[in-house]
From Swiss-Prot:
Transmembrane segments: none annotated. It comes from the Bacteria. Its EC number is 2.5.1.7. One of its GO terms (molecular function) is UDP-N-acetylglucosamine 1-carboxyvinyltransferase activity. Belongs to the EPSP synthase family. MurA subfamily. The gene is murA. It is found in: Cytoplasm. Pfam families: EPSP_synthase. The modification 2-(S-cysteinyl)pyruvic acid O-phosphothioketal is found at C116. One of its GO terms (cellular component) is cytoplasm. UDP-N-acetyl-alpha-D-glucosamine binds at R92, R121, P122, V123, D124, L125, K161, V162, S163, V164, D306, I328. It comes from Photobacterium profundum (strain SS9). It catalyses: phosphoenolpyruvate + UDP-N-acetyl-alpha-D-glucosamine = UDP-N-acetyl-3-O-(1-carboxyvinyl)-alpha-D-glucosamine + phosphate. This is UDP-N-acetylglucosamine 1-carboxyvinyltransferase. SUPFAM superfamilies: EPT/RTPC-like.
């Protein structure tokens, strides 16, 4: 049963929306809970397919896991150390089980992963990091196997390239290593900071998260604790762009403006009126002209690659020409041909996309979601296009946006989920 969204083009999107917890923080935190010998409560976990898959995976490993508002985890009974292919194939994040398993139990194996089709994301950086902490890694029959006699050993690790995933793996595993670990050229994303906050809540000694040098003083064991997942900055940005391109006015609650500085600066440059408080952001585009902006994606605190597709849509319907340069992932313009089907004028040249004035606006069409963030831009495009748009393969959206049609409906979008 393939589900699709049917969207009728309409007016401005306006109102209030409550932002969910960040998938990209919730996932590493759920996997890191394998390190805890006592019960853990994690609040503000979004309801998403990848989260469900992770909970099922942890359950298979022997974790007692329940959801009742928060997610409650008891990893004291872990008795299985292999993350099997049938679960891993749908989700790359499963590699995050490896570090905690080998750090706490001296062994772990994870099937080589699946997930979105964006470029080459090798697990080499994860493997290399664990090897530097003293683990022995082998690749056998499609599985990455890690083992260590006794405890992992602290190490000074200089990352070959900035990687959020590998930073999480090394940081998590190092919490139970003997001695001190220093990670240089570490990723600085807010989700890394949130994972470190969780680790510290259960007794780890992590400092420097959010900078390019993270220090982890190993401890013998980790207990239990409580943590609330940080707000999703990408979901926030997606709703802000929806207001900008539709000429609307939206207030995002339960969010963190400080994590979105690069995005907010570009929205202001594009002509939006932005206001912020401690945990809210408002955008007003009523009677204002949208102007195209140039963007170059970069690791945090630069402009996030996960907002690139939404801003290509903004540029396509704005006045003037905007150039977007993608420096993080290859093959990340798969939404552009779909937008061209709706009448957009854009040219892809290598890792840049040049978005020109789309005279006469967009027209509804049948389009296909190709990856998580790109698919959100197609939904927004449908709401500002003339006529009806069908977005196919929306399982990509369900992997990363909680109840997106409900939230958009409340803002005035004419959207429904249909099964065919």
């Amino acid at each position: 049963m393939m589900q699709k969204f049917r969207i009728q083009g309409g007016g401005p999107l306006s109102g209030e929306v409550s932002i969910s917890g960040a998938k990209n923080a919730a996932l590493p935190i759920l996997f890191a809970s394998l390190l805890a010998e006592k019960p853990v409560e994690i609040a503000n976990v979004p309801k998403l397919r990848d989260i469900d898959t992770t909970m099922e995976l942890l359950g298979r490993l022997g974790v007692n896991i329940t959801r009742n508002g928060s997610v409650f985890i008891d990893a004291s009974g872990v008795n299985e150390f292999c993350a099997p292919y049938d679960l891993v194939k749908t989700m790359r994040a499963s590699i995050w089980a490896l570090g905690p398993l080998v750090a706490r139990f001296g062994q772990g194996q994870v099937s080589l992963p699946g997930g979105c089709a964006i470029g080459a994301r090798p697990v080499d950086l994860h493997i290399h990091g664990l090897e530097q902490l003293g683990a022995t890694i082998t690749l056998e029959e499609g599985y990455v196997k890690a083992s260590v006699d006794g405890r992992l050993k602290g190490a000074h690790i200089v990352m070959d390239k900035v990687s959020v995933g590998a930073t999480v793996t090394i940081m998590s595993a190092a919490t139970l290593a003997e001695g001190t670990t220093v990670i240089e050229n570490a990723a600085r994303e807010p989700e890394i900071v949130d994972t470190a906050d969780f680790l510290n809540a259960i007794g780890a000694k992590v400092t420097g998260a959010g900078t390019d040098t993270i220090t982890i003083e190993g401890v013998e064991r980790l207990g239990g604790g409580y943590h609330e997942v940080v707000a999703d900055r990408i979901e926030t940005g997606t709703f802000l762009v929806a207001a900008a391109v539709s000429g609307g006015k939206i207030l995002c609650r339960n969010t963190r403006p400080a994590l979105l500085e690069a995005v907010l600066a570009k929205l202001e440059e594009a002509g939006a009126a932005i206001e912020t408080g401690d945990d809210w952001i408002s955008i007003d585009m009523t009677d204002r002209e949208l102007k195209a902006v140039n963007i170059r994606t970069a690791p945090h605190p630069g402009f996030p690659t996960d907002m690139q597709a939404q801003f290509s849509l903004l540029n396509l319907v704005a006045k003037g020409t905007g150039i977007i340069t993608e420096t993080i992932f290859e093959n990340r313009f798969m939404h552009i041909p779909e937008l061209i089907r709706m009448g957009a004028r854009a040219e892809i040249e290598g890792n840049t996309v040049i978005c020109g004035d789309t005279d006469g606006g967009l027209s509804g069409a049948q389009v296909m979601a190709t990856d998580l963030r790109a698919s959100a831009s197609l939904v927004i495009a449908g709401s500002i296009a003339e006529g009806e748009t069908i977005v196919d393969r929306i399982y990509h959206i369900d992997r990363g946006y909680e109840y997106i049609e409900g939230k958009f409906s409340a803002l005035g979008m004419n959207i429904e989920r249909i099964s065919e």
